[in-house]
C-alpha cells in the first residue's frame, strides 16, 4: 500500500509541477482534500506535494486558474497563500508589468465578490483573506506605485453599499497594519512615509464615513463604518473629532440603538482617552450628553450586578464597555469635571455607576474598575501625603482639615473601601483554600492572575487607608464582629476580611496598628476555639497565620504577642489538615527573618533567650513535620542563630541546633567504618540526603559561622561522596546507563548533589578567601575532579561545574594556580557532552559556561597559560555558546566574549597574535547570529561587541596585518571582508545597500544605540526579501521598557508606607 501511495504522490507532484501544461484543477482539489480529510501517510504525501508546489517560483501564475475554477474553498485558500507568499517575499524582484497584473487581478476579484450582498455573507472568510492580500500589496505599492489608491477606494464605495461595506474593512485593516503593527515589519522610514500618506489623504476617507453615517439605512454597512472609524480614532488629526459633528452623531444617532451601542461606546471611549487641553468644552459636552443617554438606557437605580448575571452577551459587553468608558473618561478628565460646579452632579452619577459596575461578579470588569479606583486613591494621597487624618486618639473630631478634593470624594471612597474589603483577592502566602466542590484543601498551583489582582487591590486599599484609616478600621472591625457573632459567618467572608486586614500592614500609625491588631488576633484566636470541625479550624488557622506574617513591625514591638504567635505556629505544626503545616512553616520562616534579633536576646520577664527554649524542645516541635518542612524549620532557626553576635555563644547554639542531624550522621558514619556496604542500603542513603539538605538550609541562613559545623563533617562527607561515586560507577558498569534512573542510584546522586550544594553555599557566604583556599579547596578538588572526569556523561553531576564557578567567583586570584588542574578534569569531557547539539545536558551546558565566565572574569591570566590547542577549544566553546537557542546560554556566551575581547586588549604581549588568529573568525560568527532570526533578543549585546571590534580596527589598535597574504590597511581589508561575507550570504542585496551598511559600522561605532538601529534596519531589509516576520526585532526594547517601568514603580512604592509587602522591604529598613 505505501508503495502505491508513493507512486500516486509522485504522479500528482509531477503533473502539478509541470508548468508547460494546463493545471489539472480536479487533481489539485483531490490533493487538498487528502490534506484536510486524509489520515497518516496519505495526509503527509499531500502536505509534501502542496509544499513543493507552493515553493515553486512560478506557482503564483496558477493562482487565477485556482481561484476561478476550483470548487473547493480550501483549495482557494491555498491559492491565496501562494499569492501572499509572492507578495511578501518576491514582490521587489518581479517585473513591473507582472506586479500591475497581480494588483489588477486582486482588485477585480474583490470588487466582483463583494458587490453581491448574498456572496459577501456566504463567502465571508474568503473575502477576508482577499482583503488581507490587498493590504499586503498596498504595503509594497502605496503611495509610490499607486498614488490614487485612497481616491479609488472612496470613489468605488459610492457605487454599491455592499462594496462600500467591504471597502470599510479594507481601510480598517490598512489602518491596523500601518499604525498598530508596523514596528519592525517595515523600516522606520517606510512606516513614517505610510503614516504621513494616510494622514494627508484622510479627509476623503472621513467624508465617506460621514456620508454613510448620515445617509445610509443599511445597518451592516453602518456597523462596519463605525468599526472602521474606531480603528482610526487613535491617529487621525484631532480636528476631525472635535471640530465636526462626530461626537454628537455618535451619541444622539447611534448610542441608544442596541445594534450600534457597543461600537459607539467604544468610539466614545477612544475619544475620551485623548489628552489635550484645548478641547475642554467638547469633552464636557461628550460627558454630559453620554450621561443623559445612559440614564435613559440604564436608570441609576438599576441593580447592575443582577442585570449582568441575567444579561445576554451583547448586554454583558455593554456593561464591560461602560466600565471602560467611565474609567477612561474619569482618569483623563475627572479633574475637569470637579472644577465645574454645574457638572458635579453628573460626576457623582458617574461615580455611582462605577460603584454599581464594580459589584458585577466578573473579574475582567472588576479589574477595569479597580484601575480607576487605584488611580483616584493614589492621586488623592500623592496630592498631600501628610494630611492623612492624625491619630483619632489625638484629634477630637474625625474629619478635620481635610483637603477639598478628598472632601468631595469622601462618601464614595468609604463605599470603595467596603467593596475592597468584601472582594479582596487571595494573597500568594495563603495555601489553604476552598475548592470548587466546597472542600478545604491545600493549593498546589499558584494562580498568577489572582496574585496580580491581589497586588493591585492591596495597593488600592493601602492608599484608601492612608486617606482615612479611621473609616477603614471601622469597616474592618464591624465585619470582624459579624464573623464572631455569626451574622456574616462564612469561609469566603472570613477569608476576604482577613486578607484585607493583612494587606494594609504599614499603612497605619504604629499606635493605631497595635490597638487594632490586638483586637483582631484575640477575636480570631477566640473564633478558633469557638468553631468546631477540622475544615473551620483550618480556614481560621490559615487566616491567623497570614495576618501575623504580615505585621512584623507589630511583633517586633510586642514580645509577648510574638511569643504567643510563635507558640501558636508550633501548635499548628502538629495539625495534619492539608496545607496548615506548610503555612505554619512558611509563616515561621518569615517571622524569623524579620524578627531574628528578638529570639537571641533575653526579653523582659524571661529567664533565657527564646532560641534556647526552641532548641530545648526542637524534637517535640518538629516530630509531625515532613522532611521538606523540617528543612524550612531549620532554615528559620538558622536566621535567629545568625543574628547572635557573640561568637562563643553562637558556636554553642550551632552545636545544639545541629545535635539531632549530627547524631544520625555520626551513627551512619560509624556503621560505614565497620561495613561500607551500609552505603548501599536505600533507607540509609535517603537519610544521608535528608541530613545534608538540612545542613544546606541551615548554612544558607547562618552564613560564614556555619564553618564550625561544616568542618565537623567535611572530610567524612567527601569520603561518602567518593564511596557513593564508586557505587554508581560499578552499577553502571554492571547494568548499563539505564541504571541511573533507579531510585537507589538517584538517592545516591542526591547525596552527591547536596554535598556540592552545601560546599558551594558556604563558600559563597564565607568571608576568609585564604582560609577557604588553603583548607577546604584541596580535599574538595581531590574528591570531585577525577571522579567527574572518569564518570560516564550521564553520571556526571552538573553541580561540580557550578561549584567550581562559585569558588572561582569568590576566591578570584587565590585560585588561579588551580585553574589548569580544574580545566584538565572538567573542560574537554564536558565540551564533548554539549557540542553535538543544542539540547542535551541543559544543566551541564549552563554551568559549563558559568565556569568559563568566572575564569574569564577573575582568573584571566590562567587562560593565557593554557596550551594553544586548549585555548582554541575555549574560544570554540564560547562561539558555540552564543549560537545557542537556549537564551541564557547565548547571553552568557556573548558576555564571555565581550569580557574576553576587553581582557585581551589589556595584554599587550598576547593581543596581536590573538587578533591575527581569531579576529576575522569571531567577526564572521557574530554576523551569523546577528542575521539569524532566533537570536534577535541579543541585539544590544551583538551591537556592543561589533561596535567594539570595528572600533579596534578603526583606531589602529590592531597593528598586526589581519590578512598576512596581502598586508593592506586593516580597515580596508575588514570593509571588503564584511561586504563579501554579507553578499555571499544574501545575494539579493544591492551593492549600494551593503556599502552603506558597512560604512555605518565604522562611522557609528562610538554610539551604541545608533549602531543598533543601523543593524536593525539592515535586518529588516534582509527579512523583507526572505518574507519573514520582523516583529521580533523589537523584543529587547519591549523587555527593557517593561523592566524600567517595573523599577520606576518599585521606587514609587518604596516611598508610600504599606504599599510594599513587609517581606519585600530590604532587611536594613525593618529591624
From Swiss-Prot:
Domain Importin N-terminal as annotated: residue spans: 46-112
Entry annotated with the keyword Repeat: yes
Lineage top rank: taxon: Eukaryota
One Pfam assignment: IBN_N
Modified residues (Phosphotyrosine): 454
GO molecular function ontology, one term from the record: DNA-binding transcription factor binding
Subcellular location: Cytoplasm; Nucleus, Nucleoplasm; Nucleus, Cajal body; Nucleus, Nucleolus
Key words of the record: Acetylation, Cytoplasm, mRNA transport, Nucleus, Phosphoprotein, Protein transport, Repeat, RNA-binding, Transport
GO biological process: cellular response to salt; cellular response to triglyceride; mRNA export from nucleus; negative regulation of transcription by RNA polymerase II; protein export from nucleus; protein localization to nucleus; regulation of centrosome duplication; regulation of proteasomal ubiquitin-dependent protein catabolic process
HEAT repeat start and end residues: 217-240, 241-277, 354-472, 515-553, 560-597, 602-639, 775-813, 885-916, 917-954, 1002-1039
Region ranges (Necessary for interaction with Ran and nuclear export complex formation): 327-450
Gene Ontology cellular component terms for the protein in this record: annulate lamellae; Cajal body; cytosol; kinetochore; nuclear membrane; nucleolus; nucleus; ribonucleoprotein complex
Region (Necessary for interaction with RANBP3): 411-481
Modification Phosphothreonine, positions: 448
Modified residues (N6-acetyllysine): 446, 693
Residues carrying Phosphoserine: 391, 450, 1031
Stated family: Belongs to the exportin family.
Function: Mediates the nuclear export of cellular proteins (cargos) bearing a leucine-rich nuclear export signal (NES) and of RNAs. In the nucleus, in association with RANBP3, binds cooperatively to the NES on its target protein and to the GTPase Ran in its active GTP-bound form. Docking of this complex to the nuclear pore complex (NPC) is mediated through binding to nucleoporins. Upon transit of a nuclear export complex into the cytoplasm, disassembling of the complex and hydrolysis of Ran-GTP to Ran-GDP (induced by RANBP1 and RANGAP1, respectively) cause release of the cargo from the export receptor.
Subunit: Found in a U snRNA export complex with PHAX/RNUXA, NCBP1/CBP80, NCBP2/CBP20, RAN, XPO1 and m7G-capped RNA. Component of a nuclear export receptor complex composed of KPNB1, RAN, SNUPN and XPO1. Found in a trimeric export complex with SNUPN, RAN and XPO1. Found in a nuclear export complex with RANBP3 and RAN. Found in a 60S ribosomal subunit export complex with NMD3, RAN, XPO1. Interacts with DDX3X, NMD3, NUP42, NUP88, NUP214, RANBP3 and TERT. Interacts with NEMF (via its N-terminus). Interacts with the monomeric form of BIRC5/survivin deacetylated at 'Lys-129'.
Protein name (database record): Exportin-1
Organism, scientific name: Mus musculus (Mouse)
Classification of source organism: Eukaryota, Metazoa, Chordata, Craniata, Vertebrata
Amino acid at each position: 500500500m505505501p508503495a502505491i501511495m508513493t507512486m500516486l504522490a509522485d504522479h500528482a507532484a509531477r503533473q502539478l509541477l509541470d508548468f508547460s501544461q494546463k493545471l489539472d484543477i480536479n487533481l489539485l482539489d483531490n490533493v487538498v482534500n487528502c490534506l484536510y480529510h486524509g489520515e497518516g501517510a496519505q495526509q503527509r504525501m499531500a502536505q509534501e506535494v502542496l509544499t513543493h508546489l507552493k515553493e515553486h517560483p512560478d506557482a503564483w501564475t496558477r493562482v487565477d486558474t485556482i481561484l476561478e475554477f476550483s470548487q473547493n474553498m480550501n483549495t482557494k485558500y491555498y491559492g491565496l497563500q501562494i499569492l501572499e507568499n509572492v507578495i511578501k517575499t518576491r514582490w521587489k524582484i518581479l517585473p513591473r508589468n507582472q506586479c500591475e497584473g497581480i494588483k489588477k487581478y486582486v482588485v477585480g476579484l474583490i470588487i466582483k465578490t463583494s458587490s453581491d450582498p448574498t456572496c459577501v455573507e456566504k463567502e465571508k472568510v474568503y473575502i477576508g483573506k482577499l482583503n488581507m492580500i490587498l493590504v499586503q500589496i498596498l504595503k509594497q505599492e502605496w503611495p509610490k506605485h499607486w498614488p490614487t489608491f485612497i481616491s479609488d477606494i472612496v470613489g468605488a464605495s459610492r457605487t454599491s453599499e455592499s462594496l462600500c461595506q467591504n471597502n470599510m474593512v479594507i481601510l480598517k485593516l490598512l489602518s491596523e497594519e500601518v499604525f498598530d503593527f508596523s514596528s519592525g515589519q517595515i523600516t522606520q522610514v517606510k512606516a513614517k512615509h505610510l503614516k504621513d500618506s494616510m494622514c494627508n489623504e484622510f479627509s476623503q476617507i472621513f467624508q465617506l464615513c460621514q456620508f454613510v453615517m448620515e445617509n445610509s439605512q443599511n445597518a451592516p454597512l453602518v456597523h462596519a463604518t463605525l468599526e472602521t472609524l474606531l480603528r482610526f480614532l487613535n491617529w487621525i488629526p484631532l480636528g476631525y473629532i472635535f471640530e465636526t459633528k462626530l461626537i454628537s452623531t455618535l451619541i444622539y444617532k447611534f448610542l441608544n440603538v442596541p445594534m450600534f451601542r457597543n461600537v459607539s461606546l467604544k468610539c466614545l471611549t477612544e475619544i475620551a482617552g485623548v489628552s489635550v487641553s484645548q478641547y475642554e468644552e467638547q469633552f464636557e459636552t461628550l460627558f454630559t450628553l453620554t450621561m443623559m443617554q445612559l440614564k435613559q438606557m440604564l436608570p441609576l437605580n438599576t441593580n447592575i450586578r443582577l442585570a449582568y448575571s441575567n444579561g445576554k452577551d451583547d448586554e454583558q459587553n455593554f456593561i464591560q464597555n461602560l466600565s471602560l468608558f467611565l474609567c477612561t473618561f474619569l482618569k483623563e478628565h475627572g479633574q475637569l469635571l470637579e472644577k465645574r460646579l454645574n457638572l458635579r452632579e453628573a460626576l457623582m452619577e458617574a461615580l455611582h455607576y462605577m460603584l454599581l459596575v464594580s459589584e458585577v461578579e466578573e473579574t475582567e470588569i472588576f479589574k477595569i474598575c479597580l484601575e480607576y479606583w487605584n488611580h483616584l486613591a493614589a492621586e488623592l494621597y500623592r496630592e498631600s501625603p501628610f494630611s492623612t487624618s492624625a491619630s483619632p486618639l489625638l484629634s477630637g473630631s474625625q474629619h478635620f482639615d481635610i483637603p477639598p478634593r478628598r472632601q468631595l470624594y469622601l462618601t464614595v471612597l468609604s463605599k470603595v473601601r467596603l467593596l475592597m474589603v468584601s472582594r479582596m483577592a487571595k494573597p500568594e502566602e495563603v495555601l489553604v483554600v476552598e475548592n470548587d466542590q466546597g472542600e478545604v484543601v491545600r493549593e498546589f498551583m499558584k494562580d498568577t492572575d489572582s496574585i496580580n489582582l491581589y497586588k493591585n487591590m492591596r495597593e488600592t486599599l493601602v492608599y484608601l487607608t492612608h486617606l482615612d484609616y479611621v473609616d477603614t478600621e471601622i469597616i474592618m472591625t464591624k465585619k470582624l464582629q459579624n464573623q464572631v457573632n455569626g451574622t456574616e459567618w462564612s469561609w469566603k467572608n472570613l477569608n476576604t476580611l482577613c486578607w484585607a486586614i493583612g494587606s494594609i500592614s504599614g499603612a497605619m500609625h504604629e499606635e493605631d496598628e497595635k490597638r487594632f491588631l490586638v483586637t483582631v488576633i484575640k477575636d480570631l484566636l477566640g473564633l478558633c476555639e469557638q468553631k468546631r470541625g477540622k475544615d473551620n479550624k483550618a480556614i481560621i488557622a490559615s487566616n491567623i497565620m497570614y495576618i501575623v506574617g504580615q505585621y512584623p513591625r507589630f511583633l517586633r514591638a510586642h514580645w509577648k504577642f510574638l511569643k504567643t504567635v510563635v507558640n501558636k505556629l508550633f501548635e499548628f505544626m502538629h495539625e495534619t489538615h492539608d496545607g496548615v503545616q506548610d503555612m505554619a512553616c512558611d509563616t515561621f520562616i518569615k517571622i524569623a527573618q524579620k524578627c531574628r534579633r528578638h529570639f537571641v536576646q533575653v526579653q523582659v520577664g524571661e529567664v533565657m533567650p527564646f532560641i534556647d527554649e526552641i532548641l530545648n524542645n526542637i524534637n517535640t516541635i518538629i516530630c509531625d513535620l515532613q522532611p521538606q518542612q523540617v528543612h524550612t524549620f531549620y532554615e528559620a532557626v538558622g536566621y535567629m542563630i545568625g543574628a547572635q553576635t557573640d561568637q562563643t555563644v553562637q558556636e554553642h547554639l550551632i552545636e545544639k541546633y545541629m545535635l539531632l542531624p549530627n547524631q544520625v550522621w555520626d551513627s551512619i558514619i560509624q556503621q560505614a567504618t565497620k561495613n561500607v556496604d551500609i552505603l548501599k542500603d536505600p533507607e540509609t542513603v535517603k537519610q544521608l540526603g535528608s541530613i545534608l539538605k538540612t545542613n544546606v538550609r541551615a548554612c544558607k541562613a547562618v552564613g560564614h559561622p556555619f564553618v564550625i559545623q561544616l568542618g565537623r563533617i567535611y572530610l567524612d562527607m567527601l569520603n561518602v561522596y567518593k564511596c557513593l561515586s564508586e557505587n554508581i560507577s560499578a552499577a553502571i558498569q554492571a547494568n548499563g546507563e539505564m541504571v541511573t534512573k533507579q531510585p537507589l542510584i538517584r538517592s545516591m546522586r542526591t547525596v552527591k548533589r547536596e554535598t556540592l550544594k552545601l560546599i558551594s553555599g558556604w563558600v559563597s557566604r564565607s568571608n576568609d578567601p585564604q582560609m577557604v583556599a588553603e583548607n577546604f579547596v584541596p580535599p574538595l578538588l581531590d574528591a570531585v575532579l577525577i571522579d567527574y572526569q572518569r564518570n560516564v556523561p550521564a553520571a556526571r553531576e552538573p553541580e561540580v561545574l557550578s561549584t567550581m564557578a562559585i569558588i572561582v567567583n569568590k576566591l578570584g586570584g587565590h585560585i588561579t594556580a588551580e585553574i589548569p588542574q580544574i580545566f584538565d578534569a572538567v573542560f574537554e569531557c564536558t565540551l564533548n557532552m554539549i557540542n553535538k547539539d543544542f539540547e542535551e545536558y541543559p544543566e551541564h551546558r549552563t554551568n559549563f559556561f558559568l565556569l568559563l565566565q568566572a575564569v574569564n572574569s577573575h582568573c584571566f591570566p590562567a587562560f593565557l597559560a593554557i596550551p594553544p590547542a586548549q585555548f582554541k577549544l575555549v574560544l570554540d566553546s564560547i562561539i558555540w555558546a552564543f549560537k545557542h537557542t537556549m537564551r541564557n546560554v547565548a547571553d552568557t556566551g556573548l558576555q564571555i566574549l565581550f569580557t574576553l575581547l576587553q581582557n585581551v586588549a589589556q595584554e599587550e604581549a598576547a593581543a596581536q597574535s590573538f587578533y591575527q588568529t581569531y579576529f576575522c573568525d569571531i567577526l564572521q560568527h557574530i554576523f551569523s547570529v546577528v542575521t539569524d532570526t532566533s537570536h534577535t533578543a541579543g541585539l544590544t549585546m551583538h551591537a556592543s561587541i561589533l561596535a567594539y571590534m570595528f572600533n579596534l580596527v578603526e583606531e589602529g589598535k590592531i597593528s598586526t596585518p589581519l590578512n598576512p597574504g596581502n598586508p593592506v590597511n586593516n580597515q580596508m581589508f575588514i570593509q571588503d571582508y564584511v561586504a563579501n561575507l554579507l553578499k555571499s550570504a544574501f545575494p539579493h542585496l544591492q551593492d549600494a545597500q551593503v556599502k552603506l551598511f558597512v560604512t555605518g559600522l565604522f562611522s557609528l561605532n562610538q554610539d551604541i544605540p545608533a549602531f543598533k538601529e543601523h543593524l536593525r534596519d539592515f535586518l529588516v531589509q534582509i527579512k523583507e526579501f526572505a518574507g519573514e516576520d520582523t516583529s521580533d526585532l523589537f523584543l529587547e526594547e519591549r523587555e527593557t521598557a517593561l523592566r524600567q517601568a517595573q523599577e520606576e514603580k518599585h521606587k514609587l512604592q518604596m516611598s508610600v508606607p504599606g504599599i510594599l509587602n513587609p517581606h519585600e522591604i530590604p532587611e536594613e529598613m525593618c529591624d
